[in-house]
């Protein structure tokens, strides 16, 4: 069953650091069967007060997603992400 990592980007406090993170993260995804479904897509708020930028990653299953997140390659980048942006990430399984 497909699994998704959903990230909400609430703010970027180091644009250069975040740009470096973004330029390097895709390679870490491919090694674990992951891909971007939503990244910087155009949005239209239908209801409520939506502020964060949304990113959605797709993996073949939750094991692949966890292996990506826990991988040395991604964990090496995650510190850069935490230093350069305010984000939340969740893992959710599809139907």
What are these regions (language model features)?
Residues 62-90:
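C-terminal structural segments of small proteins and small subunits
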Residues 1-53, 60-70, 93-95:
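Short S/T/G/P-rich N-terminal loop/turn motif that feeds into the first structured element of a domain
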């Amino acid at each position: 069953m497909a699994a998704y990592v959903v990230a909400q980007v609430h703010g970027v406090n180091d644009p250069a650091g975040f740009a470096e993170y973004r330029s390097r993260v895709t390679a870490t995804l491919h090694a674990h069967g992951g891909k971007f479904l939503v990244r910087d897509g155009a949005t239209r708020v239908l209801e409520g007060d939506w502020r964060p930028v949304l990113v959605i990653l797709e993996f073949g299953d939750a094991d692949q997603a966890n292996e990506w997140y826990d991988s040395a390659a991604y964990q090496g980048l995650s510190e850069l992400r935490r230093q350069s942006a305010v984000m939340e990430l969740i893992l959710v399984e599809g139907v």
